[in-house]
Amino acid sequence: MIAKPVFLLAFMALPALADAKPPLRDVTEIDNELYYIAIANEISDYCPSISGRRLKAINVMLGLRSKANSLGYTDREIRAYVESDAEKDRMRAKGEAYLAQQGVTYDNLDSFCVLGRKEIDRNSAIGVYLRAN
């Protein structure tokens, strides 16, 4: 007789499991786009001849919020992800690894400009958020 209540409890928990969402960091469409914006922002912060296309980035971020909402994430969950120190650290480490792979160093600010121009010329996922001054 104990098996029946346990089965019922387990069965009642199934909808909650079905509604479980992955962490936003695992939603690549959202996480990757935020990563591209972060790299572009870093380039524009350190290269005086390149500026960020901030309105475009803001518009895309609003779209990402809408996408996350449509996937069932609340504004509170989205804010927690975006403001999380752990997520900021993860994104920074990922970005610094990419910059280093591209030969960018904080000791050579022109290296940010070289990468920025390359990204703009390629019209890459990062380059679309940059503009040469």
Please report, for each region that a protein language model flagged, where it lies by residue.
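Sec-dependent N-terminal signal peptides
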Residues: K4-L14
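Short, flexible active-site loop motifs that bind/organize anionic cofactors or intermediates
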Residues: L8, A20, A68
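Short amphipathic alpha-helical segments and their helix-coil junctions
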Residues: A16-E29, K94-A100, R131
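Immediate post-signal-peptide N-terminus of mature secreted/exported proteins
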Residues: D19-R53
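Residue-level recognition of alpha-helical structural elements
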Residues: I50-R53, A57, L109
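Compact alpha-helical subdomains of small soluble proteins
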Residues: N59-N133
